[in-house]
From Swiss-Prot:
Protein name: NADH-quinone oxidoreductase subunit L
Keyword set, alphabetical order: Cell membrane, Membrane, NAD, Quinone, Translocase, Transmembrane, Transmembrane helix
Gene that produces this protein: nuoL
Major subcellular location class: membrane
Organism: Buchnera aphidicola subsp. Acyrthosiphon pisum (strain APS)
Similarity annotation: Belongs to the complex I subunit 5 family.
PANTHER family: NADH-UBIQUINONE OXIDOREDUCTASE CHAIN 5 (PTHR42829:SF2)
């Protein structure tokens, strides 16, 4: 008996339970319900993980029921569990479980605790649907479900107008992208007469690419459909503003899981992208440009969560870069590693913000390493993995594999930018760490924690080290076999290590040893303008505001007068006037009615005579 649907069922039950009876149970029970439902999903995922590994990457399927059946058009509610789905599920349920445990500490005395766990349970259920669905339409149900959850959790503190506006912005920008995804799905059905992933994969192997020009449009629309969700250029602006929600939300949705949905979808449909090398190159180009823009933007941010948000865009950019050079397994491996060390950094940031009485400006902290030693270690390990610190971190191996694959693919321009941005990553990451934990002690921190706080951080910390590099997703039967020559890899690793260490040292030199260097740099007016330009995200928000928002407001203002309605109202007034005088004829006098009838008959006779003689 297949029990795949239990992975979705228990978080869904948790959501319904917490949404309906939250006023009738103690708050501590809501924590337990929210965590237990995710634990069951994680346990079932582990069960299937063992089964897949024991049975040579066996694939599991389950059809729940027929969704639609109209002539030959048939859509099932079906699940497909292979190595790729399993890898994503371990991130969703495993990292999700640790974040839920941490959230039981973070949200303990905060308002809306039950609502928070209800939303996060619904998110886990929706994300599980997204990665388990065996067809595009069922997948799209989960795709939109995670968008709704993201909107609800970004605007979780809905009493503040800014939070609501940020939630609207995220929702609208991702909807723009989703329109293209829908078009891509409809084109797929038009050409393949199916939404099922495996059927499309089978049919695509028989295509004559030269005569199938629609394939470029299909993959282009799929790409445009995923860049919004994964915060890639040019629809990346929502992610930095999404940090207004609770910090565990940023760890769960906007770092570890939802923003990687685009990477998953391209990987799932890799057989289509392989047939369109031009679009595949565009995937790598978008990833590379996003890496560059987000890395430079992170260098100038002061808000700790915005720094981590830009680093998330950058790391997802590396995944897109890997997909663009057909390094499928490297992209998914880095996705897993990134989910681990970025969850560690976000949860540590949440604990730090709470300890510093909701302060997020890193320059208003300082010298906290003695007050918060465990958080200091967590930031060091998570940051080291983010910057690919050599040999002892998981990020060194996962990101190193991506850059090496790019080098061997011959995309030297992509490789140089990726390598340069790896250097920038080391600078802005340890800038954040040095400013917060070194220097003068500016802020007094509250260091009260418990096991719900410490255990998730410790597990994530351990997996962010070299131990995490032993995680090997079972993808050999998912993607086509590829061979990357390993000659000169040692020299490549030496160069990457030198760049990472140089970035760390430069960060230490500027922000700890010689702060006056920055003052000298900002004496130049051009540098101050450049700093402001990067701080505002390269002007993307300004461009969208000028091009779309103001234009929409202008059209709305013009239409508020409603010219069409004025025309309709004109005819209405004419009818009302005619009706008013017509009613005057109904005065109750018989002589008036007889005279009117005679006059009418004479008028009709005159018309008849006129038309007869003409």
């Amino acid at each position: 008996m297949s029990i795949i649907f239990f992975i979705i069922l228990f978080p869904l039950i948790g959501f319904l339970f917490l949404s309906t009876i939250q006023d009738f149970i103690f708050k501590r029970y809501t924590l337990n319900i929210g965590i237990f439902s995710i634990f069951i999903s994680f346990f079932i995922t582990c069960f299937y993980g063992v089964s897949i590994l024991k049975n040579n990457n066996q694939v599991f399927t389950q059809i729940l029921w027929k969704w639609l059946s109209i002539n030959e058009f048939k859509i099932d509610f079906g699940f497909f569990l292979d190595g790729l789905s399993l890898s994503m599920l371990f991130v969703i349920t495993g990292v999700g479980l640790l974040i839920h445990i941490f959230s039981s500490w973070y949200m303990r005395y905060k308002e809306g605790q039950s609502r928070f766990f209800a939303y996060t349970n619904l998110f886990i259920a929706s994300m599980s649907v997204l990665v388990l669905a065996d067809n595009f339409l069922f997948m799209y149900l989960g795709w939109e479900g995670v968008s709704v959850c993201s909107y609800l959790l970004i605007g979780f503190y809905y009493t503040e107008l800014k939070n609501n506006l940020c939630a609207f912005k995220a929702f609208i920008l991702t909807r723009v992208s989703d329109v293209f995804l829908m078009i891509g799905m409809f084109l797929i059905y038009r050409e393949f007469n199916s939404f099922n992933f495996q059927e499309i994969k089978f049919l695509s192997s028989f295509l004559n690419v030269e005569n199938f020009y629609y394939l470029d449009y299909i993959t282009l629309f799929l790409l445009l459909g995923v860049i919004g969700k994964s915060a890639q250029l040019p629809l990346q602006t929502w992610l930095s503003d999404a940090m207004v929600g609770p910090t565990p939300v940023s760890a769960l949705i906007h770092a570890a899981t939802m923003v990687t949905a685009g990477v998953y979808l391209i990987a799932r449909t890799h057989f289509l992208f392989l047939l369109t090398p031009g679009i595949l190159y565009l995937v790598g180009l978008i990833g590379t440009l996003t890496i560059l823009v987000s890395s430079i933007s992170a260098l100038v941010q002061k808000d700790i969560k915005r720094i981590l948000a830009y680093s998330t865009m950058s790391q997802i950019g590396y995944m897109f870069l890997a997909l663009g050079v057909k390094a499928w397994s490297a992209a998914i491996t880095h996705l897993i590693m990134h989910a681990i060390f970025k969850a560690l950094l976000f949860l540590s940031a949440g604990s730090l913000i709470k300890s510093c009485k909701n302060e997020k400006n890193i320059f208003k902290m300082g010298g906290l390493r003695k007050q918060l030693p465990f958080l200091y270690i967590s930031f060091i390990v998570g940051g080291a993995s983010l910057v690919s610190f050599p040999l002892i971190t998981a990020g060194f191996y996962s990101k190193g594999n991506i850059l090496f694959s790019v080098l061997k693919s011959g995309c030297i321009d992509f490789f140089i930018i990726g390598l340069f941005c790896s250097f920038l990553t080391a600078i802005y990451t340890f800038r954040m760490i040095f400013v917060i934990f070194h220097g003068k002690n500016i802020h007094t921190a509250d260091s009260s924690t418990n096991l719900q706080h410490n255990i998730p951080l410790f597990v994530l910390l351990l997996l962010s080290t070299v131990f995490g590099s032993y995680i090997s997703p079972p993808l050999s039967d998912v993607f086509p076999l590829s061979y990357t020559p390993i000659d000169h890899k040692f020299a490549f690793e030496i160069i990457c290590s030198i760049l990472s260490l140089s970035g760390i040292y430069l960060s230490y030199y500027i922000w700890i040893k010689n702060l006056y260097v920055l003052d000298k740099i900002f004496q130049f007016k051009f540098m101050r303008y450049l700093y402001y330009f990067f701080l505002k995200g390269w002007g993307f928000n300004w461009f969208y505001k000028i091009s779309f928002v103001y234009f929409y407001l202008y059209i709305s203002k013009r239409l508020s007068a409603d010219p069409l309605n004025k025309i309709i109202n004109y005819f209405l007034k004419v009818t009302q006037i005619f009706n008013f005088y017509l009613l005057k004829t109904s005065n109750g006098y018989v002589r008036w009615y007889v005279a009117s009838m005679i006059l009418g008959i004479n008028f009709i006779f005159l018309l008849m005579l006129f038309f007869y003689f003409n």
